[in-house]
Amino acid sequence: FMDIKRVISAVRGQADRVTVVMPLLYESRQHRRKGRESLDCALALQELQNLGVSTIVTFDVHDPNIQNAVPTSMSFENFYPTNTILKEFIKNEEFDPESVKFISPDTGAMDRAKYYANMFQADVGMFHKRRDYSKVVDGKNPIVAHNYLGGNLEGETAIVIDDMIASGTSMLEVAADLKERGARKVFLISTFSMFTNGLDGFNKAYEDGLFEKLYSTNLTYVDDNAIKTPWYKQIDCSNYASDIINTLNTSGSISELKNGKQKILTMLENKKNGEL
């Protein structure tokens, strides 16, 4: 982040405007205060605004309400790679669009799951993370159970949606629960995949048949070892990002870039009719 500020300081004297493209928003998960935490993301955005940044471009920010930290002179543009991911998923996977359920692994990802579900005209389910407030492990209250809230999964294709995989433990526990509930196939979709605890857990879960594939993007660094696995499908968002940058640079409208629903709906209709 300091390097970004140095570059801004170096160029802002001559630049007509400064746009910062930050696919994974700095400190985006430190976005609210529950106890005595610092509001790192809000402070970072205000620093960029004070340095004269006119626009910040980011993708699938953890909480879009963070833009309220800079409501005036800096434009905050949050894009979703949802349609780019869905195009690849619909094209590559065999599934019945009439037997799909979208699953949120916790309450925070529910809006994402609902968007996907509305595109497919499908049902949505959710897991509630039950935590043990008497203990603190790695700075957090440990999760003791994932409680499923939703309809019957017997014979369904379950698609788990989240913005980020850190260690991936919760995602894999959810996948295991879905298989126990009778889901025929389980797919995982995440914009950012960090694999902070390595790949062993995912490799074992895949070998055990807990999930079919993980769809993720190249909007942040991904270990080459993950890309080489049979269960990881990387979605290239380079063209999407370049279209955004070019449109902003030429003062064009970004509305079309934020709305690609019709293409997905057409692909889904073709899938239902066996034409894809």
List each model region and its residues:
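PRPP-associated nucleotide enzymes
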Residues: 1-276
